[in-house]
Amino acid sequence: MDKRVIRTKRTIKETLVKLLQKTQFEHITVKTICDEACTSRITFYNYYSDKYALVEEMFEDYMNEALADYYALQKENNKEKDDIKGYNNMLTAIINLVTNNRDFFEHTGTASNPYLYSGFYNYIYNCVMTYINHHHDNVKPKYPINQIVTLMCNGLWGIIAESFSANTDFAELKKNIFGLYNDILRSGLFERTQPNLVG
């Protein structure tokens, strides 16, 4: 991709994040984005059909960032492809993504920006669903996978949102999430073919 295109698209995305600090997504217009970014609407529409297409690409960027982090973690500390370590690496990648891009994600709550919440939730949901479907040799959900994934994703997002509100320290946030989710993996919600894997 042309460097000028990359630079322009990055500016547009950064501008939307900046606008979210003071304005709900539903009240942000393409004109507002362009005015703030010093970009013409013609340029904007060269790349995006509307602001929703812009956000969709941002979600894809974020998910690619998280997946790259996940695969790097797997290569670094889970060459044996242990299911539990894989779950933890997936959680780490999601937490890293959200904390590294806090200016965006702290404005994706159900109350402030429901469209952004539902959009990104669907990406996370599909990611976790795919993981569980492909990595449940040793840890198998006892109940329907879609219900387990809904519980895990809503819970994770709720904890992160609450942590943002309370300005929870990153290390403490990570510790609490890992403790909670490893307890869930030990619980009766999952059937373990090798009981000692979680520890």
Predicted features by range, described:
Residues 92-121, 161:
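Amphipathic alpha-helical segments used for helix-helix packing
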Residues 112-138, 146-154:
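Amphipathic alpha-helical packing segments from all-alpha helical-bundle domains
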Residues 71-101:
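Hydrophobic alpha-helical connector segments
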Residues 8, 12-20, 124, 128:
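Short hydrophobic clusters on alpha-helical segments that form packing/core surfaces
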Residues 29-30, 58-71:
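Short, basic, alpha-helical segments at the C-terminal edge of helix-turn-helix-like DNA-binding modules
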Residues 19-53, 61:
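Helix-turn-helix
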Residues 4-11, 144:
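N-terminal positioning helix adjacent to the helix-turn-helix/winged-helix DNA-binding module
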Residues 133, 154, 162-199:
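C-terminal peripheral helix-coil segments that are non-catalytic and often amphipathic
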